Swiss-Prot record:
One of its GO terms (biological process) is Mo-molybdopterin cofactor biosynthetic process. The keyword Cytoplasm applies. Belongs to the MoaE family. MOCS2B subfamily. Gene3D superfamilies: Molybdopterin biosynthesis MoaE subunit. Its EC number is 2.8.1.12. This is Molybdopterin synthase catalytic subunit. It is found in: Cytoplasm. The gene is Mocs2B. Catalytic subunit of the molybdopterin synthase complex, a complex that catalyzes the conversion of precursor Z into molybdopterin. Acts by mediating the incorporation of 2 sulfur atoms from thiocarboxylated Mocs2A into precursor Z to generate a dithiolene group. This protein is produced by a bicistronic gene which also produces the small subunit (Mocs2A). One of its GO terms (molecular function) is molybdopterin synthase activity. Pathway: Cofactor biosynthesis; molybdopterin biosynthesis.
C-alpha cells in the first residue's frame, strides 16, 4: 500500500514504521532527512519548505508507481514530507519501504530519495543566525539546463543547418556579413530612426497652428470642443503627452447657473405687480417665440426661469453651434407667404368693362 502525505507538523516516525510492518516482509528500509545546524560556515537556525501541493502529490504517486514497477516485491511504501518551518534536528522528509528481502528495500529507498529531490516541486529556504531573511536553495539533483550569458546572447547556428548551398548569388540581393553585436547595433539604429520619423509626423499633425493664421478662420468652422497641444514625451515609451487643453466655451467653464438663477429669480416682497406685468408683456412674448417655449404659467418670474433653463439646455447640449442657430421671425414668415388670388364673378367683370368704355368715350 502507498502512504503519501504533506504535513505541516512534526513527522511521527514510529507511526510510519507501524505502517510498514507486514507478516510477509523480512526487511524495512527507512530514510529520515533532518535539519543540520551549519552550511558553508554559516549557522543554520531552521529550514522553511514550500510546495505546489497538488503537483507534488501527483509526482510522489508517480514515484511509487515506478518503485513497484522496478521492484515488484515491495509491500508498503511511505513518503512523508514536512512543510513550513523545520527546526534543527527535526525530520523534514521520511521515505520508507518494506519488502521480503533487504536488497529491494534498500535500493528502492535510495532511488525514491533521488527522484524526490529532482522531480517533486518542493522548495527549501535556509534561515541563518544573523540573517532572518534567509536564502533559497536549489536542488543539485534537479537536471537544470546549464546556460551561460554568452550562449543566451548568441544564436546556435548548428541547430538549424542549411543543407542546400546557393551559388552565383545575384548582386541585387543584400548580403550582411557582420557579427552579432554590429547587427544588433544596426537594428537599434534603424528602429530609433523610424520612431523619430513617426514622432515627427505626429507632432506635425497635432501641433498648434501658426499665429499668423487668423483665429477666426480656424475656430469658426471647427466642431472640436477643445484645442489640445501635444508635444514629444521625453525618456518614455509614450511619445506624446497633452500639454494644455483650452476649453473656450461650454458648461464645464461656466459657473453654477442653476444656483445663481434660483437666487436671482427669488421674488422680492417690495416688487410692484404693475411693473412686473408691463415688463412681461413687453419682452417675454418675443423671447418665448424665439426659444420655442410655451407660456404655461401666468407668473412672469417663472416664465423667465423657463426661458433661462431652455438656454442652458441648448448651450450644454451643443455649445459650439449656439452662434449658428437662427430661427425665422414672424416678419420673414409673412414675406414668404404667397399672395392669395382674387376670384372675379361675371357680373363684376361686365361692370369693370363698362367702366373702361365710359372712360375711353369721354
Amino acid at each position: 500500500m502507498d502512504h503519501i502525505q504533506l504535513v505541516n507538523s512534526q513527522i511521527d516516525i514510529n507511526h510510519i514504521h507501524n505502517l510498514l510492518i507486514d507478516e510477509s516482509c523480512g526487511a524495512s528500509s527507512v530514510f529520515v532527512g533532518t535539519t543540520r545546524d551549519n552550511f558553508d560556515g554559516k549557522k543554520v537556525i531552521s529550514l522553511e519548505y514550500e510546495s505546489y501541493e497538488k503537483m507534488a502529490l501527483k509526482e510522489m504517486s508517480k514515484i511509487c508507481s515506478q518503485l513497484r514497477a522496478r521492484w515488484p516485491d515491495l509491500k508498503h511504501i511511505a513518503i512523508y514530507h514536512r512543510l513550513g518551518t523545520v527546526p534543527v534536528k527535526e525530520a523534514s522528509v521520511v521515505i520508507a519501504t518494506s519488502a521480503p528481502h533487504r536488497a529491494a528495500a534498500l535500493e528502492s529507498v535510495t532511488f525514491a530519495v533521488e527522484q524526490l529531490k529532482s522531480r517533486v516541486p518542493i522548495w527549501k529556504k535556509e534561515i541563518y543566525e544573523n540573517d532572518t531573511i534567509g536564502e533559497w536553495k536549489e536542488n543539485m539533483e534537479c537536471p537544470w539546463p546549464q546556460y551561460s550569458k554568452a550562449s543566451l546572447r548568441t544564436f546556435d547556428f548548428s541547430s538549424c543547418k542549411i543543407k542546400q548551398t546557393i551559388e552565383n548569388i545575384p548582386d541585387k540581393l543584400v548580403q550582411i556579413r557582420v557579427n552579432d553585436s554590429d547587427l544588433n547595433k544596426r537594428v537599434k539604429c534603424f528602429l530609433k530612426r523610424k520612431r523619430d520619423e513617426i514622432n515627427l509626423h505626429n507632432i506635425n499633425d497635432f501641433k498648434q497652428q501658426s499665429s499668423q493664421i487668423p483665429c477666426e478662420e480656424t475656430t469658426t468652422f471647427s466642431c472640436a470642443r477643445t484645442q489640445s497641444f501635444l508635444v514629444k514625451q521625453q525618456q518614455s515609451s509614450g511619445h506624446l503627452k497633452v500639454r494644455r487643453a483650452n476649453n473656450c466655451c461650454g458648461p464645464q467653464v461656466r459657473p453654477n447657473y442653476s444656483l445663481q438663477l434660483n437666487k436671482l429669480m427669488t421674488p422680492q416682497s417690495d416688487c410692484d405687480d404693475l411693473i412686473e406685468y408691463k415688463l412681461g408683456n413687453s419682452r417675454l412674448r418675443n423671447i418665448e417665440a424665439y426659444m420655442c417655449v410655451s407660456p404655461d404659467d401666468d407668473n412672469i418670474l417663472n416664465r423667465i426661469k423657463n426661458i433661462e433653463d431652455r438656454i442652458l439646455l441648448i448651450e450644454s447640449t451643443s455649445p459650439e453651434y449656439k452662434h449658428f442657430v437662427q430661427f425665422g421671425t414672424d416678419s420673414e414668415k409673412t414675406c414668404l407667404k404667397k399672395p392669395k388670388k382674387e376670384v372675379y364673378l361675371t357680373d363684376r367683370i361686365n361692370e369693370f368693362l363698362t367702366k373702361i368704355k365710359r372712360e375711353i368715350e369721354q
